[in-house]
């Protein structure tokens, strides 16, 4: 199959960290162009700023959480390739737990766990379609926790690429401990 390549990397950082991150990245030898952009008050704003900083000639945009440092090259390639016949692709892992919706401390109902997947990143989309979704979300005050959610509002077809448990998000002390065990 055709080999897809990543031309540019964009890192969104808080405004007050721009200079530090530019210095840090500048000290690393890399073969790709790395753009450092100011993020925003929300993930949506950071993604918008990042996407707008990419070349208009870019076909695909691959969004990845820096809090998921154990992403594999293979998962990135699978995500990019899944976009060939879809509007986008997300990495997700199947859920094996029983899921309940609860209201005011009481179980309301059980959701079929076979229908529940836990989204990870990367999430890859055609740049033009993602910009449509960002525009729609802004105009309609839609707040989302990931880009796939924005795409869903416009009925774009998003493929699921099976991820793996090591592509976890580091957000708690337990996650840090798990991460340090993987690095050692």
Question: Which ranges hold each PLM region?
Answer:
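Conserved alpha/beta core of the MobA/IspD/sugar-nucleotide pyrophosphorylase nucleotidyltransferase superfamily
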Residues: 117-184
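Acidic helix N-cap motif at the loop->helix transition within catalytic regions
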Residues: 19-24
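A structural signal for isolated positions on well-ordered beta-strands in alpha/beta enzyme cores
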Residues: 8-10, 35, 159
């Amino acid at each position: 199959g055709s080999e897809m390549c990543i031309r540019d990397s964009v890192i969104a950082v808080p405004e007050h960290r721009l200079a530090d991150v530019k210095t840090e990245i500048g000290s690393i030898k890399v073969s790709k162009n790395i753009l450092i952009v100011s993020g925003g008050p929300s993930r949506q704003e950071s993604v918008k700023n990042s996407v707008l900083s990419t070349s208009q000639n870019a076909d695909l945009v691959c969004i990845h959480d820096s809090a998921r440092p154990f992403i594999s090259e293979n998962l990135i390639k699978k995500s990019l390739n899944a976009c060939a016949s879809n509007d986008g692709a997300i990495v997700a892992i199947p859920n094996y737990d029983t899921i309940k919706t609860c209201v005011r401390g009481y179980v309301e109902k059980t959701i079929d766990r076979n229908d529940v997947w836990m989204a990870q990143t990367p999430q890859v989309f055609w740049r033009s379609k993602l910009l449509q979704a960002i525009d729609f979300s802004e105009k309609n005050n839609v707040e989302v926790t990931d880009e796939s959610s924005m795409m869903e509002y416009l009925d774009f077809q998003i493929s699921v690429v099976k991820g793996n448990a090591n592509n976890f998000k580091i957000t708690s002390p337990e996650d840090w401990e798990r991460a340090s065990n993987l690095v050692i």
